[in-house]
Regions:
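Terminal targeting signals and extreme-terminal segments of soluble enzymes
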Residues: 1-110
Length: 110
């Protein structure tokens, strides 16, 4: 596998920081801005870590400002609804300068 592919896969390994908070490193790209697809993938991973046993059904995201590759992204999660088969997770992606993106995820037991 190429180094770029391994770097991307490593970004999906989120670390727990505090309750309901995860941290992910950024893929090192030449233009020093976060790739939106990386944020989407990390949102999906954070949602599934927050509601274990459920698969992602939908993810709605708003990108609020550019993120920077030189610093980690912190994912804060909130679960407004969790039942036996469905869950809803609100996610906020933050860096030093503030909120980078927000998302709402719907998860379901398949």
């Amino acid at each position: 596998m190429s180094d770029l592919w391994n770097d991307l896969l490593g970004c999906l390994d989120l670390a727990p920081c505090e309750p309901d908070t995860w941290e992910g490193r950024s893929q090192q790209l030449e233009y020093r801005r976060l790739f939106g697809g990386q944020l989407l993938a990390q949102f999906a991973v954070a949602a599934q870590l927050t509601a274990p046993g459920k698969g992602l059904k939908s993810l709605h995201t708003q990108f609020l400002r550019e993120g920077r590759t030189g610093e980690p992204v912190r994912y804060e999660t909130e679960v407004p609804q969790q039942g036996r088969t469905f869950a809803t997770v609100r996610l906020t992606a933050r860096q030093e300068r503030g909120v980078v993106a927000v998302a709402n995820a719907s998860l379901h037991v398949w």
